[in-house]
Each structure stands twice: as structure tokens, then as C-alpha cells.
Amino acid sequence: MKKKVQMKKMAGVFLTLAILGIGLFPPGNVYAAANQAPDADPVVVVLDPGHGGHDQGARYKWDGKTYKEKQLNLAIAKTCKTELEKYAGVKVYMTRSSDRFVTLGNRVNFAKSRKADLFVAIHNNASLKKTDHGACVYYPNSGYKEEVGSEGKMAAASIQKQLGALGLKNNGILYRNSAVGARYPDKSKADYYAVIKRSKYAGFPGLIVEHAYVSNHDDSTTFLNGNDRLKRLGVADATGIAEYFDLILDQAPVLQTPVVNADESVTLAWNTVQGADYYRIYRRIAGAKTYVCLEETEETGYTDTGVMPGTSYEYTV
């Protein structure tokens, strides 16, 4: 399971600066060239619009308008996908993009085939008690594969925060254990919901987002009535997911030609990225697995005085 991206509200492009050494140029000299580095593996999010085809989900009529859950879920998911794809470092898939039926097992199997880091089932709620209203997010329990549960809980909280900000009643983040005593291989209680349980077996968190109650007049007419209001829900989901993964909007600083100074230090410069609170400069020896953070700055330039002639380095900003 992929860990959270560690760059938040800062420049999100990888840039390579090679300090070319012995064998290519005379010893003792420092030479610099800037190139675009290979992209890091993206975060993979699979959105699952609930129901579809013959499975309509909840269906209620208010003030002469019929609210069909399967249609609402799909509209919210499409907006969420569009919004998420504005961020750098994320790949988004949907289990269905039209009005068709997909089994619960195939929904999770699809996510597994795409090597998902997070599975988000998009739903709306219903109750026999028509006064019930508000939003909640279900996440995996803390038993079997505890890290899946803890990551899912954090992702759920991030999404729920955004939904609450829209004015929906905050019904919190919840988990639900099997009602029939089912157990995981380690004998801990199994999750109740199939997509959450199957996702845990597959190794990634599965969430169910219940946006609003189709069975409640005010929820339906205030939050589910029309494309603009459904888009707000999709944007809220995307914002919550982006904040959980620390994604940034897909804007990249452009590295100017590096300057090798007389003292053999190297000066980097890049353009301003709107919305970036700061920039982090990382360096590693070419071919090494890990980067070392050199500096965190609000400026759009940095001079590295720690380079050694004869060594190749790679930088990220």
C-alpha cells in the first residue's frame, strides 16, 4: 500500500541536475545540466459509483422530482474524477462510467487490477425514518491488516471534513463489523460491508461515502437537487482525497539553466507556483534510492554549496 505523498502545498515536479564528474570532464571541475526527471509512481484512486443498471439504489420523490440514487452517485463520481485529475501525481479510475450493473466483487477486483491505493464507493443514504439526514463515511475496522484500517480512517476523516463544510449534518466517520460473526484469518471481527472487506483482503483501504439522505426532503432538495449541487459534493470528495494524499494542483516550477559558480557551488532557480506555501529542495547521489532534504524555502532559488566534483547528483524541487 502506497504511503501518503509527503509534499503538501509546495512545488511538485521532479527536476534533475547532474553534476558530471571524472571520466566525462577534467577532474576538479563541476559541470551542470538540467533535465526533466522521470515521474514518480502516481497515487491510484478508484471511484465506485454505487448501484447501476437494474440496481437503482434508493429512490424517492420530493416536490414532483424523483431522486434516483444510482444517477446521483454517478454524477458525483464523475465530478470527483474530473476534480481529482487537476492534481499532480494521481491516477483516477471509475468502476462504471455509465448506467450499468457491476457486482461488488468485480468492483473491488477492478480496483485491485489497477493497483489501487484507495477505493472510494460513492453512495447516498436512505432510512425508513424520514427525519434522518446528513453525511457519514464508513472505513475499515482496526482488526486484520491494521494499517489498512488506520489509513482508511484518516482518509474517511478528510472526506467527511469537506462534506461537513458544505452544511451537511456531520454524522461522523464509522466502521461496522459483521452482523453474523464473520472473522478474518487472524480471528478478528470481519468488516460488515463487502467492498470494505474485499478491499482489505486486497491490501488497500475501502471507503463508503454516504453523502446525504435521499429519503429526507431537506437533504434531497438542498444537496442533491441539480447538477451544480451534485458537483459541490464531487468537489468536496476530491478535495478530501487530495488533502489525505497531500496532493498539489498540477502546476510545476520550470527550472532555469543551472549556474555553476566559480567556487563550484551550484545555483538553482525556478518560477513561482501559485498556491505554493514553500518549496523543498532535495538532493541525492545519482542512482541512490533516497533523497536528502537540503532546504525549505519560500524563495524561488537556492545555492547548493555542498557538491563534490566527480560526483553526479539528482535534485527535486
Where are these regions (language model features)?
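Sec-dependent N-terminal signal peptides of Gram-positive bacterial secreted proteins and lipoproteins
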Residues: 4-30
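Active-site-proximal helix/loop segments of hydrolytic enzymes
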Residues: 32-44, 67, 71-252
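Short glycine-rich His-centered loop
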Residues: 42-66
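Pro/Thr/Ser/Gly-rich low-complexity, intrinsically disordered linker/stalk tracts
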Residues: 246-275, 309
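Hydrophobic core positions of the immunoglobulin-like beta-sandwich fold
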Residues: 270, 302-305
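Solvent-exposed loop/turn segments flanking beta-strands in beta-repeat/beta-sandwich domains
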Residues: 271-290
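Beta-strand-rich modules
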Residues: 279, 304-317
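Short beta-strand segments within Ig-like beta-sandwich modules, predominantly Fibronectin type-III
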Residues: 292-299
